[in-house]
Amino acid sequence: MVSIWTIALFLLGAAKAKEVCYEQIGCFSDAEPWAGTAIRPLKVLPWSPERIGTRFLLYTNKNPNNFQTLLPSDPSTIEASNFQTDKKTRFIIHGFIDKGEENWLLDMCKNMFKVEEVNCICVDWKKGSQTSYTQAANNVRVVGAQVAQMLSMLSANYSYSPSQVQLIGHSLGAHVAGEAGSRTPGLGRITGLDPVEASFQGTPEEVRLDPTDADFVDVIHTDAAPLIPFLGFGTSQQMGHLDFFPNGGEEMPGCKKNALSQIVDLDGIWEGTRDFVACNHLRSYKYYSESILNPDGFASYPCASYRAFESNKCFPCPDQGCPQMGHYADKFAVKTSDETQKYFLNTGDSSNFARWRYGVSITLSGKRATGQAKVALFGSKGNTHQFNIFKGILKPGSTHSNEFDAKLDVGTIEKVKFLWNNNVVNPTFPKVGAAKITVQKGEEKTVHSFCSESTVREDVLLTLTPC
């Protein structure tokens, strides 16, 4: 039996398509695949550039606090600005119900200025994003065309190569970047920060962000649970050459605080309120921004699933290495292999989000006991707290392995401290030791070994030195 919904879609598709044309950026239709489909049932045309009012706000190392407005139709605005044609350009494009002057965009620019000289352009299309979702999703096409127009102007008037450009788009902004990239041959890079699911997941590549939109496309997924029933705003669909799923890509640590503590945020009431409404979705740009200042703090591991990653089946990095999620993903040697690549990692629950993964194996000695075996690493750059490696029967001669994510890179490991404990009192006061502990950092092939012939009672530290 044909459903009423199917009939309605048929009638929508059968209606004559409409089209609007705008000077310098072309024509836009509401024909398939843009409308009249199961994913995009409503026929909605994008607004005009004048109504959307897109602005290009330039920040540079010379003007990190006050923007200069650039116009894609007026090259003189480039000449009158601090735009440097010998430096890279990174555009940051916001998403639904957001704006180009929101703090997070400028904060991201300022982090860039700490590590490089760069043109940082915040794309403000708030008039086109602060409307109904369906309308905003269609306005994406015009905003993307305007970004492409800006890139074309830079190329035509200043011989500025698109290969020098990165488009960073959050939410709907990721698909704005995709539209711009599809119109700009040779675009260097697009980074999608939790590309939005609704109206885009499952659509043809021409509608959404995809790997053909730039020479390199990387995507960070932080809110990939289904929109219905879990209210996940981001897509689970792989849309880049490298797709990163931190913490599994659905539930970010630190996002399940109670309402009051979430709203009364360290970054202010407004940012806290945003976090309360869409914490997982917003984590993507927070991870990216922090990655700029942590070149090696977001190493990501190829894995079939997050469950496999959490089961310690994807460690250490393969021979080709591991990419860094975020700003330095483009340094990965095999970033544009033919197959889309899926990567996993864990982050912290609040700033600082960076983590360094270690694999540890313990060979026990001493008496048989029940309890937990823990290890802390001490290195040239600092030390970790105690991590639980094994819980159960501590049997001499047995070897137990685990992985953990440390808050810092300890540097060259100089010693390891072993501790065991049990909440149940043992009247025999057994002594347990670690005859050997091996440690490997995820991105390195070297396995470091530490030994001791001693044993200790419960809650007494045992120091192991290189052997």
From Swiss-Prot:
Keywords associated with the record: Calcium, Disulfide bond, Glycoprotein, Lipid degradation, Lipid metabolism, Metal-binding, Secreted, Signal
SMART domains the UniProt entry points to: LH2 (SM00308)
Subcellular location field: Secreted
Gene3D superfamilies per the UniProt record, alphabetical: alpha/beta hydrolase (3.40.50.1820), PLAT/LH2 domain (2.60.60.20)
Recorded GO CC terms: extracellular region
PLAT domain residues: 356-467
GO BP: any one term: lipid catabolic process
Domain of life: Eukaryota
Disulfide-bond pairs as recorded: 21-27, 109-120, 255-279, 303-314, 317-322, 451-467
Glycosylation, residue list: 157
SUPFAM superfamilies: alpha/beta-Hydrolases, Lipase/lipooxygenase domain (PLAT/LH2 domain)
Molecular function via GO: calcium ion binding; carboxylic ester hydrolase activity
Annotated consequence of substituting residue 198 to P: Removes steric hindrance and restores lipase activity
Signal peptide from the UniProt entry: 1-17
Amino acids binding Ca(2+): 205, 208, 210, 213
Coiled-coil spans in chain: none
Tissue spec. comment: Detected in pancreas (at protein level).
Keyword Ribonucleoprotein annotated: no
Pfam families hit by this protein: Lipase (PF00151), PLAT (PF01477)
PROSITE patterns, per the entry: LIPASE_SER, PLAT
Catalytic residues as annotated in Swiss-Prot or TrEMBL: 171, 194, 281
Role: May function as inhibitor of dietary triglyceride digestion. Lacks detectable lipase activity towards triglycerides, diglycerides, phosphatidylcholine, galactolipids or cholesterol esters (in vitro).
Family label: Belongs to the AB hydrolase superfamily. Lipase family.
Protein's name according to its UniProt entry: Inactive pancreatic lipase-related protein 1
Species assigned in the record: Canis lupus familiaris (Dog)
Source species taxonomy: Eukaryota, Metazoa, Chordata, Craniata, Vertebrata
